């Protein structure tokens, strides 16, 4: 059943990676009994609401080796951990201000033998490392997110696509747009035909392209 959902939407995934996704679920299930890392309700739909949701980035973006990605407000390690398993030559920096979550993520990194993931217990306001892409999942309203992270971008692009923000959100988008920037909006339901994704959006903001 678990393998089937990945084979349906991501048929090119290696079986060894799928096994690690299953292991990731088991780790979360174990620790969630003691610490509320993700909601218990979403744990019942773990592969759909956490893994598939994270992997929708992979449908659009391919990160080249040695790219640097910052995952802001990573929570239980999403979308950073699933993407780090796919792009194992890309550097992922996962940040969250809640120490207990960071401790669990460190354990996950060890259990999954991830060599390309680094964690920091801090707020993005106080974090000044530079990167190619910043990922967030329903952290705050998009204009506020842009304001918080724009200091963290490298100006020189490394990938075929421009450096930018990769943001997963639900609900409306038009009232959050900043007309200074170029956005590409993807309806996740177009490539993940699950009811959960009906109103979910993937927003790609191209950081170093401004509309004057």
UniProtKB/Swiss-Prot annotation:
Keywords: Cytoplasm, Methyltransferase, rRNA processing, S-adenosyl-L-methionine, Transferase. It comes from the Bacteria. Belongs to the methyltransferase superfamily. RNA methyltransferase RsmG family. It is an enzyme of class 2 (transferase). NCBIfam families: rsmG_gidB (TIGR00138). Specifically methylates the N7 position of a guanine in 16S rRNA. This is Ribosomal RNA small subunit methyltransferase G. Its EC number is 2.1.1.-. InterPro entries: rRNA_ssu_MeTfrase_G, SAM-dependent_MTases_sf. One of its GO terms (cellular component) is cytosol. It is found in: Cytoplasm. The lineage of its organism: Bacteria, Pseudomonadati, Bacteroidota, Flavobacteriia, Flavobacteriales. S-adenosyl-L-methionine binds at residues 73, 78, 124-125, 137. One of its GO terms (molecular function) is rRNA (guanine-N7-)-methyltransferase activity.
């Amino acid at each position: 059943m678990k393998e089937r959902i990945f084979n349906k939407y991501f048929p090119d995934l290696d079986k060894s990676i799928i096994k690690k996704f299953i292991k990731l679920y088991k780790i979360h299930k174990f620790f969630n009994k003691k610490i509320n890392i993700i909601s218990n309700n979403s744990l019942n739909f773990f592969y759909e609401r956490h893994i598939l949701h994270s992997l929708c980035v992979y449908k659009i973006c391919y990160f080249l080796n040695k790219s640097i990605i910052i995952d802001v407000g990573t929570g239980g390690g999403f979308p950073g951990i699933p993407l780090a398993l796919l792009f194992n030559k890309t550097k992922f920096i996962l940040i969250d201000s809640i120490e207990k979550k960071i401790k669990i993520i460190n354990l996950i990194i060890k259990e999954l033998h991830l060599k390309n993931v680094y964690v920091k217990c801090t707020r993005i306001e106080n974090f000044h490392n530079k990167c190619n892409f910043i990922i967030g999942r329903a952290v705050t309203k998009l204009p506020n997110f842009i304001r918080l992270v724009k200091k963290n971008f490298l100006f020189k692009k490394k990938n075929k696509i421009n450096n930018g923000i990769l943001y997963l959100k639900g609900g409306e988008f038009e009232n959050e747009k900043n007309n200074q920037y170029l956005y590409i909006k993807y309806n996740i339901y177009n490539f993940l035909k699950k009811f959960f994704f009906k109103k979910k959006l993937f927003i790609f903001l191209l950081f170093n392209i401004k509309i004057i």
